[in-house]
Amino acid sequence: MSQLVDTKKLSPSNQVIFNIMLRKAKIEDAQAIQNLICFYSEDGKMLFRSLEDIEQNIEDFRVYEKSGEVVGIVNLKFGWDKLVEVRSLGVDPRFHRQGIATEMVRDAIEQASLNLDCDTVFVLTYAIPLFEKLGFQIIDKINLPQKVWNDCQQCLHQGNCDETAMSFSLLPFRKVSVINDNNNDEVLIPQ
């Protein structure tokens, strides 16, 4: 499996390049984010998001910037029974096949792993090979909690979902310490 990028190990000059390329979205990015979402939502490949919704949730977006232009987007939605969803993943078609989506999913995994309340990343996707190469496993949609499906009410494919559910466990990436409790049982403590 591919390694996640540790920006602390990059030289200072490379950190600047990396942070410019793949970074937390800013409010100024909202229109560019919506433009990519609109492109993919026109044919039902992504759920439409209003500009207002994007602006209200801008802190949950990451963008891939190339030459000052937002060419890739991804959104993480936290809050379901230790699950985090990778959603609104899209790359400007002019920049397809350059590894941008791969880097964005790796970054999303890394961002999700920083939240100790999350054990699993999941996605509903058409891009099965992309997620498989990054270690995601196909799962039955029925295993996802019902509240996950709230966003699907506005989907063109509601009631006949043709996306594949996939998941990725964050637990192997957690740093833990093993201690003995009062019963001399080993207990894992996240660090």
Q: Where would I find each of the regions flagged by the language model?
A:
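Short amphipathic alpha-helix that is part of the acyltransferase structural core
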Residues: L4-F48, E65, E163-A165, P172-Q191
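A short helix-loop-beta-strand connector motif used in the catalytic cores of GNAT acetyltransferases and
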Residues: D53-S67, G159-D162
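Short, high-confidence coil segments that cap the C-terminus of an alpha-helix
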Residues: E59, D117-C118
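Conserved beta-strand in the GNAT
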Residues: V63, E69-F78, K82-G90
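Conserved acetyl-CoA-binding loop-helix of GNAT-fold acetyltransferases
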Residues: V91, R97-A112, V123
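Conserved hydrophobic beta-strand within the GNAT/NAT acetyltransferase core sheet
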Residues: C118-L124
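Conserved active-site alpha-helix within GNAT-family acetyltransferase domains
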Residues: T125-D151
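Cysteine-cluster motifs in flexible loop/terminal segments that predominantly coordinate metals
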Residues: W149-E163
